[in-house]
């Protein structure tokens, strides 16, 4: 099975798998059952921003979700990613819909990682930034239903030609280049990721959510990982 660390924007509470009984953001370490959650005042039809950061000195993974003109939501969890993830990984975004649905539109996405060792010369870093997504992106690996539209947006799940979200959809987008996320001799391994998103839904209860995730380089959508499993995990264990 894939090794996954994720930050989830979970729009639909699945209390049977340990979700709190409201939309929330959460940090997932190798399981859909979040290690830490915070209530998320989701605003459909408004562009939101997510900022995720990790620093191997503090060993803290944190995420902040905000909408213009309203207060932000923060979640954090103390974890040493050296003990969880392989040395080389890929970073991605995933989303699902189920019986209920929503658009899972990504408007921009940036990522920076730095790996500092004792040697001044030896710094591994990776940076990418998408402010628009091209129609046939060479620098993204699109999985499942994910596609880029003519407006320069990344749609992680299916939408109709008129822009309406479709149910029972799962899609992911990964940056093509692997990331050197840690190394035994590294003094500091850190990363920052930011993306902007737009969730719209005709349903009273939108579903299911969007994630930023880090996984082994050969990661693929697990069978049966739709809906509440957010395209990341084969089961709810």
UniProtKB/Swiss-Prot annotation:
UniProt keyword annotation of Nucleus present: no
Native source organism of the sequence: Dioclea grandiflora (Mucana)
Family indicated by similarity: Belongs to the leguminous lectin family.
Binding of a carbohydrate, residues: 12, 99-100, 228
Cited function: D-mannose/D-glucose-binding lectin. Has anti-inflammatory activity in rats. Induces histamine release in mast cells from rat. Induces lymphocyte proliferation and IFNG production. Shows toxicity against the aquatic snail B.glabrata at concentrations higher than 50 ug/ml.
InterPro entries, per the entry: ConA-like_dom_sf (IPR013320), Lectin_LegA_CS (IPR000985), Lectin_legB_Mn/Ca_BS (IPR019825), Legume_lectin_dom (IPR001220), Leguminous_Lectin (IPR050258)
Lineage: Eukaryota, Viridiplantae, Streptophyta, Embryophyta, Tracheophyta
Note: Binds one manganese (or another transition metal) ion and one calcium ion. The metal ions are essential for the saccharide-binding and cell-agglutinating activities.
Official protein name in the record: Lectin alpha chain
Quaternary data: Homotetramer.
One Pfam entry name: Lectin_legB
């Amino acid at each position: 099975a894939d090794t996954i660390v994720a930050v989830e924007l979970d729009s639909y509470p699945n209390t049977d798998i340990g979700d709190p009984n409201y939309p929330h953001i959460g940090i997932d370490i190798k399981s859909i059952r979040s290690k830490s959650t915070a209530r998320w005042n989701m605003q459909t039809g408004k562009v939101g921003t997510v900022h995720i950061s990790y620093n191997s000195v503090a060993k803290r993974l944190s995420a902040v979700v905000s909408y213009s003109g309203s207060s932000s939501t923060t979640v954090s969890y103390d974890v040493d990613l050296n003990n969880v993830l392989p040395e080389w990984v890929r970073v991605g975004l995933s989303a699902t819909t189920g019986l209920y649905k929503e658009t899972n539109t990504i408007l921009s996405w940036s990522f920076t990682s730095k790996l500092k060792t004792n040697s001044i010369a030896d710094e591994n870093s990776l940076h990418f930034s998408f402010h628009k997504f091209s129609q046939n992106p060479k620098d993204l690996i699109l999985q499942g239903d994910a596609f880029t539209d003519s407006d320069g947006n990344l749609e992680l799940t299916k939408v109709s030609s008129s822009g309406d979200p479709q149910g029972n959809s799962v899609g992911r987008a990964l940056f093509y280049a692997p990331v050197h996320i840690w190394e035994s001799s590294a003094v500091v391994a850190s990363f920052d990721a930011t993306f902007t998103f737009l969730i719209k839904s005709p349903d009273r209860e939108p579903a299911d959510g969007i994630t930023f995730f880090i996984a082994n380089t050969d990661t693929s959508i697990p069978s049966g990982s739709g809906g509440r499993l957010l395209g990341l995990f084969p089961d709810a264990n």
